[in-house]
C-alpha cells in the first residue's frame, strides 16, 4: 500500500461547535475515494459535548453553557476559547485495507503528536492506560489532564472529530463537569504551566506534527 499523502490543513477560526459538527458530517457524507484527507483547526465558543458513552449526570451544572450530544466516542468534555481543537477527517483505508486495524495506531499517533508538541515547551506528559488523552507526568500538576481526544470511525473507515489541547483557557468550566467521566479529575493548560506561546503557534505546531505523522 502506498504512503498516504499529508492531509490538507484548514484554519476555520472561531466557529460554533454545532456548525463544525454539521460540516464534518457533511464532508464525510460527500467524500469519495479521491477526496483528500483534511485537518481542521478550530476554536470554539464555550460548549460541553457528550460522546456516545456519556452519562448526562456527569454534567454537574452547565451554568448556561450549551450541552451538545455528538456521535464521537468517549464521555463529556469542554471546549472553549484558548483551546486548540483539531478535527481529523481521514480515510483510514489509505493506511490499512481493514481500517479497524489502524484505529489504535491512529490514536497512538494523535497522542504522540500532542506529547511531542508539549515536549517542545519542556512540558513532560504521558498516556494513561484505559483513559484516552494526555496527562502531566511530573511536577505540581502531575496527573492533570491537558488534552482530550474522541473520534468517530464510520464503517467505511472514514473518521471525524479529533483532539483538543488546552493552551490558555479559563479552566473553571471543567469543574462543572466530571471531565471524561472522571470525578474530580484535574485539568490544566499550557499557560498555567509557564509555557510562553500563543494559540496560533500551538495550533500550527500540533497540526503540522499530525500531518507529518499521518503521512508515514
Curated annotation (Swiss-Prot):
* Coiled-coil region list: none
> Secretion signal: which residues?
none
Q: Which GO terms describe its cellular component?
A: cytoplasm
A Pfam match is LplA-B_cat
Which domain of life, per UniProt? Bacteria
Q: Where would you find this protein in the cell?
A: Cytoplasm
Q: What is this protein called?
A: Octanoyltransferase
Q: Which organism is it from?
A: Janthinobacterium sp. (strain Marseille)
Q: Which gene is the coding source of this polypeptide chain?
A: lipB
Amino acid at each position: 500500500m502506498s504512503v498516504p499523502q499529508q492531509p490538507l490543513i484548514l484554519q476555520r477560526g472561531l466557529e460554533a461547535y454545532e456548525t463544525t459538527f454539521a460540516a464534518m458530517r457533511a464532508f464525510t457524507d460527500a467524500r469519495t475515494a479521491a477526496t483528500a484527507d483534511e485537518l481542521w483547526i478550530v476554536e470554539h465558543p464555550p460548549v460541553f459535548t457528550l460522546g456516545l458513552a456519556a452519562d448526562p449526570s456527569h454534567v454537574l451544572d452547565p451554568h448556561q453553557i450549551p450541552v451538545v450530544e455528538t456521535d464521537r466516542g468517549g464521555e463529556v468534555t469542554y471546549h472553549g476559547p484558548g483551546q486548540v481543537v483539531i478535527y481529523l477527517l481521514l480515510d483510514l483505508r489509505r493506511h490499512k485495507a481493514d481500517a479497524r486495524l489502524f484505529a489504535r495506531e491512529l490514536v497512538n499517533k494523535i497522542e504522540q503528536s500532542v506529547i511531542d508538541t508539549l515536549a517542545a515547551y519542556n512540558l513532560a506528559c504521558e498516556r494513561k492506560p484505559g483513559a484516552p488523552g494526555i496527562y502531566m507526568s511530573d511536577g505540581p500538576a502531575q496527573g492533570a489532564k491537558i488534552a482530550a481526544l474522541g473520534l468517530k470511525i464510520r464503517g467505511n473507515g472514514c473518521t471525524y472529530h479529533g483532539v483538543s489541547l488546552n493552551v490558555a483557557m479559563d479552566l473553571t468550566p471543567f469543574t462543572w463537569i466530571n471531565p471524561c467521566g472522571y470525578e474530580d479529575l484535574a485539568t490544566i493548560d499550557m499557560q498555567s504551566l509557564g509555557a510562553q506561546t500563543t494559540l496560533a503557534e500551538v495550533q500550527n505546531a500540533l497540526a503540522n506534527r499530525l500531518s507529518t505523522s499521518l503521512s508515514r
